[in-house]
Amino acid sequence: MRRFLSALCLAFACLAAPAMAATSVSDDSQDADKLPSEMPGYSMGMLRELADRVQRTGLGMDMIPALYRPHYLSISDADLSMENEDIVFLVTYPDNRVRVYPRRVLVWHEVVNDVLPDADGLLPPPLPGVPEAAGEEYCITYAPLSGSVVAFRSKAGKYPSSFGVTGYLLNGNSMLYDRVSRSLWNQLLGICIEGPFKGKRLERIPVLSARWKGVKERYGGLDSQFNGKVEVLSRSTGFKRSYGKDPYGSYHSPGTYYDNNHLPFTIDSLDTRLPPKKRILGIEVDSAFGAVQKDAVRQVRVLNFTLGITPLVALHDEEIDAVRVFDRRLQGQEQPLSFVIFEDKLIDEQTRSEWLPTGKSTYGKLREKELSPLLAIDSMWFAWASLYRNTRIFPPPGQ
């Protein structure tokens, strides 16, 4: 523990020094630099520039240990070591399995390499010499300094791979590496900026930030449809860490990293339209980028807006303190719905049908209809804006 905290302090000290570029892959072809990557708005040449701005922090590769095939608990067992206000991250997998990842654990590891069990509830055994190639794998990542949480399918290019933590930063956001080629990937962009997979982008899956109190009540109740189907990441990781504490401070205590606007690392371009550590949901639609202010949505509960030509709505789920973003058009229909709060109920103005903040209608003409969710990335503003340029803010600052 002392060694880890000492390394952490060294990391912040090193960040005060000029940026040190990661070793770049040599490519003198100007034509190659103009080629597009899989990330909208980023050419291969722009990725080269990002790689040149990667900062070394003093932490070596894997000094922050990623988890691989960790253990899980029931909600009732996990509750014994959780606080009601703890932040947790929820992922609903394709088989409708729900897994909960406490931020208290991820802040110490940053990466969880997860493998889903088969239909019989068994984990497939690793293949000889290629442990990454067995099972349906996913990667849940959390970058503490930028507060960004992103989940991916664990494939580097076409190859299954687990991921590790490099200890490098790009605009305060974590850099990861895959264990197949050791290429460098930026967590927030989900793109490889250096190595054999340069220009490739990871397939992202939705992850929801919420509060433990609401999550355990909704998913763990005896009458819950999810009863017995939800698993919580265990603190029994095999590593000695103070999982009850956050090495960076607390969201609830003044005077910590999360409570001020100081950034102890280099930012290429600081967008001052919002405070740097303001919590936002970053969204991407048809190559247009947006940032939804979470606290603004909490206050009004519903926010109708349009990004590009896509009509969207952000809804606050008060029970679990989560914000989701949906397309306001029902499947097969071009005319968008508009949502309001009427007599403390969420309704659409077109049919007066009632809706849940999960995007499902429960009463009226549209009963049982569901809105299509939009993938949204929970992050601090400074990190998102530095990598997703020309981002529109909803609601606009000052409103």
Describe the residue ranges of each PLM region.
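Mid-to-C-terminal functional-domain signal that highlights helix-capping/loop sites
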Residues: 22-399
